[in-house]
Structure formats: structure tokens, C-alpha cells
């Protein structure tokens, strides 16, 4: 049925449900999992000398947080006996990074949460999940 499942993570509680669902599906189908955490690019402004955090500090913090989120998925998969690989990537549009990663890794299913950390912004500009659903050539399982 499925051979490689992509489960993006942002560390939210709802994403933890998507991870658990992906692990269960992987166990049932013998699939492996790829996980991905998308980091936001540095928020440059017109007044660049007034940045509250230096760019390298921002990048280091983003990587540390993203790597921790990926490690949580890797640990959960390992505890369940499911093969899993993970990555972090910087992207302006997380949905594009999700679809690019799915293609690069040869995934045949994306399992993701119905919403993530963006809260009200997602209601105003549309969620990453809806963009993945709209543009994905693969099946997408949305977990609520």
C-alpha cells in the first residue's frame, strides 16, 4: 500500500496526533517515514541595522528548535520500530518545502495536521495544509 510517508512537524499538539497516525499507518503497511520541520527565513526589514536579534543567532535558534522537533518524531518512530529519517529546511512557504521534500524522498502519502502554530493568521491567509491539499499530486491525510 504505502511505502514512504512524509509527516511534517511544527511541534504543536495537533502535529503530535499526525505523527502518531503516520507511525500507526507505517506499522500497518510496512512503510518508512520521513519527517520535516520547516524553518522560517530571517525577517529582514528596511531598517536592517535595528534588528532585535543578529541573523546568525536567529538561524542557530531556528535550527536548534527545528532539530528538536525532528528528533521527537525520530524518537517516537524508533520506539514503535518504524524506520524514519528527518530533515530541517528553510523556506518562505512551508507548503512548497513539504511538497518538494515529498517528491525528493519518493513519498507516496503525506500525513499532516489540519492546522499548525499559525493560529489566526491561518484563518486569514489560508493554512499550509490547505495549500498542500490544493497542490499535492499525492494523497494527503489530514489529522484533526
What are these regions (language model features)?
Residues 1, 139-144:
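Short hydrophobic/aromatic patches at helix-to-coil boundaries
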Residues 3-52, 76-85:
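Small/aliphatic-rich secondary-structure junction motif
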Residues 51-54, 102-105, 128-129:
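Short, hinge-like loop/turn segments at secondary-structure boundaries
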Residues 53-68:
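A short acidic, glycine-rich active-site loop
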Residues 75-110:
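Structural beta-alpha unit
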Residues 109-134:
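Glycine-rich, Arg-bearing micro-motifs that act as flexible, cationic patches
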Amino acid at each position: 500500500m504505502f511505502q514512504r510517508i512524509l509527516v511534517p512537524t511544527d511541534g504543536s499538539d495537533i502535529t503530535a496526533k499526525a505523527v502518531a497516525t503516520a507511525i500507526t499507518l507505517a506499522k500497518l503497511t510496512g512503510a518508512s517515514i520521513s519527517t520535516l520541520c520547516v524553518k522560517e527565513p530571517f525577517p529582514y526589514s528596511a531598517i536592517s541595522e535595528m534588528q532585535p536579534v543578529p541573523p546568525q543567532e536567529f538561524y542557530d535558534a531556528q535550527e536548534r528548535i527545528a532539530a528538536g522537533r525532528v528528533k521527537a518524531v525520530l524518537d517516537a518512530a524508533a520506539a514503535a520500530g518504524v524506520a524514519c529519517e528527518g530533515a530541517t529546511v528553510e523556506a518562505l512557504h512551508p507548503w512548497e518545502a513539504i511538497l518538494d521534500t515529498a517528491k525528493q524522498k519518493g513519498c507516496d502519502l503525506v500525513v499532516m495536521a489540519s492546522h499548525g502554530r499559525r493560529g489566526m493568521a491561518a484563518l486569514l491567509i489560508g493554512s499550509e495544509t490547505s495549500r498542500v491539499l490544493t497542490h499535492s499530486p499525492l494523497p494527503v491525510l489530514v489529522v484533526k
